């Protein structure tokens, strides 16, 4: 009798689950059907716009009466004219995210990071089965992470960090086999942590989580291994009779025994971590040993990197820089990486100090920053391991064929600027790059800018506005105050970024700007003179000039931003967040007008000439040469 009742209950539940599936299917089909004259992608996008507050009007050209949304800003379409990308990062948008986003059934990329969007993440988001990238970080989303996120089986990149999300980690996240990167850091999540399939993940900044799931005050679902399958009802399945009852008891006993074994192993690992003086803990993964910290920063063995790079063969050399050489490597699991072998590895401080600094750097995670994949440390060697960027650096691509078109150059400028904004204004503690140049801006598979080589940048103390140290950088990119006093600040990077913009405009290295036109004297004065005389055709890349494939207004705006960034006095230069807005067309006119009223640039031009543009002083240096000068000791404030 009892088994019959259980069976009836299961049949009833299965029936309702089937009805729910039919409802979901019908709603999905309804999203694909459209009455005559109605484009449901347009309808969905207009619903999204209606739920958002857009102070800068970036969505103004979204028109409800339009037939095709593919020409709208922030919208990307496929060759078949389906909307596959929605990207409105760092636009100061507020409001909520409309559930209508799920009617954009072909979406592959959603980038809404660095806004002020609040409310709950729509539970319907699990219907976007083609979604590959979802970035909702740095907003004000609250509530639980929808369980349906686990249905996104095509998702490879998921960032929900820096929100106000709460509740337990959905177990469905452990089933996302395609997920390569996951960041849930700095929320209010609680309970045990599932075993993520993502190779790289971060969960720091969630004080209520239970690392092992065995803590006595841990609330939520028990941590389970990925290989264990549970029935959807959560109750044992009886086929009837005492025999099945006994079988259930046996299975229950077995599960209980396995659970005790996992608890014992967890306690052992916890004990070993507590007794390990190292700040990292050992885990096994496949056929090799590695060490990881919270967030899955991996520690490599030196032998492993030797094998990966063919003993650091010159054939694998990708580039040389001020901090060391970079080699292409292939790991045992066929992952392609870039290995930076630091100069003077044995003299970069102790092991604990180095690991602590590396762990802090690894927390700087942003779409436009080169993610630190891992590190290696021995008594004589220190190495950093990064993802391999197949498109190389901006500097190398500027010299390659086909040349970068104007739209890509502008996208590179905005992307690099956003990466620097994160380092300066959102990273804690803040990071100064100190060597911003085209060679340190890498390009991912989609030609998006990724700022690299900030791995050993000095960290800003919260109580200091500058750092005094050895002057490191590339001639032509070094701000005058940094070169003369050794004081670096965020405005030092702003200066270097201004030079980077001119590199993008001219297609030349910093010291080549005036040589083509046989110009002598101060390079920035020459650029300013050309701009005043409205002869920007003398400045623009010859390859772009031949094809006339650039926007004259946008070119003029980029040169203006470059000149604002390279003003002599650091206090007159804009912040990087202001630079981003100006590159996007917001506030440039006001900033430019204010700079023209100031005569500080003209008063200091002679000083710039002395510090930066003496051809005799730097005759033996190229753009790839790194200048290392011991900074003068400062006796006190100046």
Swiss-Prot record:
Disruption phenotype: Enhanced susceptibility to geminivirus infection.
EC number: 2.7.11.1
LRR repeats: 104-128, 130-152, 153-175, 177-200
Active site per database record: 435
UniProt-annotated binding residues for ATP: 318-326, 340
Protein's GO biological process: defense response to virus; negative regulation of multicellular organism growth; protein autophosphorylation; protein localization to nucleus; protein phosphorylation
Keyword Iron: no
UniProt family annotation: Belongs to the protein kinase superfamily. Ser/Thr protein kinase family.
Official protein name in the record: Protein NSP-INTERACTING KINASE 1
Taxonomic lineage of the native organism: Eukaryota, Viridiplantae, Streptophyta, Embryophyta, Tracheophyta
